């Protein structure tokens, strides 16, 4: 990037994210009118894509001489990523075989992930920290992709704005058939996350409601958290 600037002292703030090739200046996943208040696009809200990855840079009091200068900057990621994986595909297949009129093929299921409480929605490039949150955010995954030999299936995933410390969000994961009937619901699923790390949460998302004797689950979540550095 090349800038024409007069001699003096400057503050440099940068934000980079993905844009559509046919309209590169339009905001796609983040509103970037102000770098002190970068906010996620919530209408519509989009998840299940790595195109939400982004990076920023902030440095104050940069002295620029009359002859100019060349700077190399190291961008930082203000995000953490997580994914939800159902580990009970084989148990669900058994339910399909026993009651095919109730339990449709995996490709006919819809998964909805609802963030419980507030979800980080804003980021201040000048401080390197989230600065806003909203409630009522959710996303859906329609038609699960898997092979007949798979024992696990990816239900969904998202990126979360973070600072330099660990934090968490709680979600409700609801699985429905193509008629909207609820087959399983797991609430209070805690997702721990950390900047530039991937958190993978495994659980009985497809059959947990059956094994617990009902559809709704509102107990302590016993999932497994794997973090890759």
Predicted stretch roles:
Residues 1-27, 94-194, 223-229:
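Tryptophan-paired
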């Amino acid at each position: 990037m090349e800038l024409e600037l007069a001699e003096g002292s400057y503050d440099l703030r940068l934000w980079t994210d993905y844009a559509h090739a046919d309209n590169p200046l339009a905001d796609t996943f983040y509103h970037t009118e102000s770098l002190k208040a970068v906010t996620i696009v919530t209408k519509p809200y989009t998840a299940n894509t790595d195109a939400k990855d982004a990076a920023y840079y902030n440095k104050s009091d940069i002295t620029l001489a009359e002859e100019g200068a060349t700077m190399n900057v190291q961008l930082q990621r203000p995000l953490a990523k997580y994914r939800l994986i159902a580990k009970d595909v084989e148990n669900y297949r058994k339910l399909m075989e026993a009651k095919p009129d109730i339990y449709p093929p995996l490709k006919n299921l819809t998964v909805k992930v609802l963030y419980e409480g507030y979800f980080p929605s804003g980021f201040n490039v000048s401080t390197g920290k989230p600065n806003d949150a909203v409630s009522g955010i959710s996303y859906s995954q329609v038609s699960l992709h898997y092979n007949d030999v798979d024992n696990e299936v990816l239900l969904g995933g998202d990126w979360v704005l973070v600072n330099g410390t660990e934090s968490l969000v709680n979600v409700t994961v609801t699985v429905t058939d193509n008629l909207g009937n609820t087959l399983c619901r797991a609430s209070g699923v805690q997702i721990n996350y950390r900047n530039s790390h991937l958190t993978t949460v495994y659980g009985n998302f497809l059959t947990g409601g059956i094994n617990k004797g009902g559809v709704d689950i509102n107990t302590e979540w016993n999932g497994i958290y794997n973090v890759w550095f």
